[in-house]
Amino acid sequence: MFEIHPIKKVSVVIPVYNEQESLPELINRTTAACESLGKEYEILLIDDGSSDASAQMLVEASQAPDSHIVSILLNRNYGQHSAIMAGFSYVTGDLIITLDADLQNPPEEIPRLVAKADEGYDVVGTVRQNRQDSWFRKTASKMINRLIQRTTGKAMGDYGCMLRAYRRHIVDAMLHCHERSTFIPILANIFARQAVEIPVHHAEREFGESKYSFMRLINLMYDLVTCLTTTPLRMLSLLGSIIATSGFSLAILLVVLRLAFGSQWSGEGVFMLFAVLFTFIGAQFIGMGLLGEYIGRIYNDVRARPRYFVQKVIRPASSIDIEENH
């Protein structure tokens, strides 16, 4: 029987990228939600290479009187999950909550996640109710969730929602993973003994635009497929066997038809032969593309370049210049 450790301190990790319009409300609402917990807390805001005034606003927030905000400034944009991992490196709490900066997931839900984690869960996920996103975003999210469920066997309903709570030992385990492509909700579930999901409210985006374009969603799907499983490689082997068998069978059939109906029939089947040829070539290109994705990821991991580069950390009581590679 595992001992359930009480939650004494809560750390909230929020990646920020060009969110200057939403930052004042985000900070106020998140601080109010944490104050209502009756526990120690800290709010870690990670600037992921913003080109607007977000970084300066974070510095000012950390230096404000009675601030609980730790600002972490990355030297450029590394992506949402790398920014969160940077925040994980500086947390001091027993429970770590991740939250997006766009306020679509209300910070007021934080006490509910803490209460659920207090029941002994390692990971508390969330499911967005009445999603206020476009049809394309919702459809893409459903496809990604189904893909993840099938490849991982974990019956979590909404992997795309970043409003989640993790026990400290889960975060420590994730920090020991050094692969370049990281999808935090999936990685956390690999180490979690007990995980649960709760429904949460989902609001419309009031400020700015979504940072996930069509191409970024496509890249995310490629990342998920290639970092989760080697099943596509096995499927390629199976597909190759099927195509080879079909091609051999078709060749035998064409020989028989040629002998039975003469050369005239053979000439009339030229277009079918081209169609079959293009089908095989297309299958080869698909296979080469998937193999290239895996080889590219192996290459990136072998180079062992830093996942992110922390330029500066500003704590409530002092400003500390740090240059770190992770």
Swiss-Prot record:
Pfam families: Glycos_transf_2. Residues 257-269 are periplasmic. The keyword Transferase applies. It is a multi-pass membrane protein. It catalyses: UDP-4-deoxy-4-formamido-beta-L-arabinose + di-trans,octa-cis-undecaprenyl phosphate = 4-deoxy-4-formamido-alpha-L-arabinopyranosyl di-trans,octa-cis-undecaprenyl phosphate + UDP. InterPro entries: ArnC_tfrase, Glyco_trans_2-like, Glycosyltransferase_2, Nucleotide-diphossugar_trans. Pathway: Glycolipid biosynthesis; 4-amino-4-deoxy-alpha-L-arabinose undecaprenyl phosphate biosynthesis; 4-amino-4-deoxy-alpha-L-arabinose undecaprenyl phosphate from UDP-4-deoxy-4-formamido-beta-L-arabinose and undecaprenyl phosphate: step 1/2; Bacterial outer membrane biogenesis; lipopolysaccharide biosynthesis. GO terms for molecular function: phosphotransferase activity, for other substituted phosphate groups; undecaprenyl-phosphate 4-deoxy-4-formamido-L-arabinose transferase activity. Keywords: Antibiotic resistance, Cell inner membrane, Cell membrane, Glycosyltransferase, Lipid A biosynthesis, Lipid biosynthesis, Lipid metabolism, Lipopolysaccharide biosynthesis, Membrane, Transferase, Transmembrane, Transmembrane helix. Residues 1-235, 291-326 are cytoplasmic. HAMAP family: ArnC_transfer (MF_01164). Belongs to the glycosyltransferase 2 family. This is Undecaprenyl-phosphate 4-deoxy-4-formamido-L-arabinose transferase. It comes from Escherichia fergusonii (strain ATCC 35469 / DSM 13698 / CCUG 18766 / IAM 14443 / JCM 21226 / LMG 7866 / NBRC 102419 / NCTC 12128 / CDC 0568-73). The gene is arnC.
